[in-house]
From Swiss-Prot:
Modified residues (N6-(pyridoxal phosphate)lysine): 230
GO molecular function terms noted in the UniProt entry: glycine hydroxymethyltransferase activity; pyridoxal phosphate binding
Pathway: One-carbon metabolism; tetrahydrofolate interconversion; Amino-acid biosynthesis; glycine biosynthesis; glycine from L-serine: step 1/1
Organism: Cupriavidus necator (strain ATCC 17699 / DSM 428 / KCTC 22496 / NCIMB 10442 / H16 / Stanier 337) (Ralstonia eutropha)
Name recorded for this polypeptide: Serine hydroxymethyltransferase
Amino acid sequence: MFERSRFTIDQIDPEVFAAIQQENQRQEDHIELIASENYTSPAVMAAQGSQLTNKYAEGYPGKRYYGGCEYVDVVEQLAIDRVKQLFGAEAANVQPNSGSQANQGVYFAVLKPGDTIMGMSLAEGGHLTHGMALNMSGKWFNVVSYGLNAQEDIDYDALEKLAQEKKPKLIIAGASAFALRIDFERISKVAKSIGAYFMVDMAHYAGLIAAGVYPNPVPHADFVTTTTHKSLRGPRGGVILMKAEHEKAINSAIFPGIQGGPLMHVIAGKAVAFKEALTPEFKEYQQQVVKNAAVLAETLIARGLRIVSGRTESHVMLVDLRAKNITGKEAERILGEAHITVNKNAIPNDPEKPFVTSGIRLGSPAMTTRGFKEEEARIVGNLIADVLDNPHDAANIASVREQAAALTKRFPVYG
C-alpha cells in the first residue's frame, strides 16, 4: 500500500516538509549554544523513523501484554544492557518518555503525597521537577530547597544542616544551570545519615559522566535519572538507573504507573546512541566539550563578563549580563539575530522576572559535535562579547553574523 517513492513528506505534506527544511537550514547556519541541545547522528534519527513506531509493546522484554513483540524485545534489551554498561548501573528502565517523566517515576515509586523532598533551588540552578511550586513535584510534596554559598558553589554544610532538621524522605541532586562538579558522594552520605533515598538527576551531565570527565553518581545514588539527548547526544527521552533492589518498584511505577505503551522507535534510538557513547570517539568528544567550555568561559571573562561561580568545570556556564546593562531576554534576541543561539536564564538572586532574567546560559556540546575546538570556541566567545558590547549597532550585528556564517560553513552539521 505504502510505496516509498510515493508517500514521501514533500509529496504528502509540503507545509511540514518546508518547515523541516527550514529548521535544518537554521541548525546548519546558526551557532548552537543552548546547553540542553545537541545534534543526533543520522543512525539515531533512522532508528526513530523506523517501522518500530508501529508497534505497541506494553510491559517489558519477555513480559508483554501484546503479541508480536519478539523483535522490539531485542531492541529494548540492547538499550538496557548498553546503558547499564555505560554507567556501571545494576538495573535500568529505558521507557520514560522524558527526563521529567523519569523523575516522576521515581517519585511515584517511593513517595506519597505530602512527603518531604529536598532539591536544589530553581532560582540557584536547580530544575523545575525538583520541587518548583508550579510543578507536580511542588504541588504533591512538601519541598525544602538548598542552594549556593558565597562562592556560588553548592553549600554542602547548609544542605546537611537542612537535611538533619527537615528529614526529607528523598534528597535530589542535579541541576539545569550549575557549572561546577557536584560532590555526589558527600550528598549520599547526608542521605544515608537520615535514612533518606538519594536520587541524582544527571540529565545535563550524562554524556560527560559516560566518558569519565565528570563524577559518576551511580555508585552513590539509589536512583539516577537522565534525559538521553543533551550531552548524551541521543533521541529525546528519559532513563532511570537504579540499585537492583529498586528495579521492581521502578518498573511498576513507569508501567502501569504513569505510562502505557513505550515508544519503541525512540527506545531504538536510545540503543543506538548508547552504542555510540561506548566508543573511544565519544570519550574524545566529551573531553573536547569540556575544553571548549573552559575556553569559552575564559574568553568571556577576558572580555569583561562575569561567569557565575567564576568558571566552568563542565559543559555549561551562566553569564551575568548586568555589567552590560542588557537583560537575558534582550541578549537572547539580539544574539539570535547574529545567528548565535542561546537561552535567557536567571542568575542566583536575579532581580529580574523569570521571563526577562539577568543572564544567559551557554553550553558547548552542540558546537563541539559540529567540530569546533579551542580556536573556534575562542572565536565564538569573542563574537558573543562583540554583540554584547554594541547590541543595538546594526552594522556590528551584521558583521558578527557574517563571521558566524564563515564558521558554520567550515563546520557543517550533517554535511
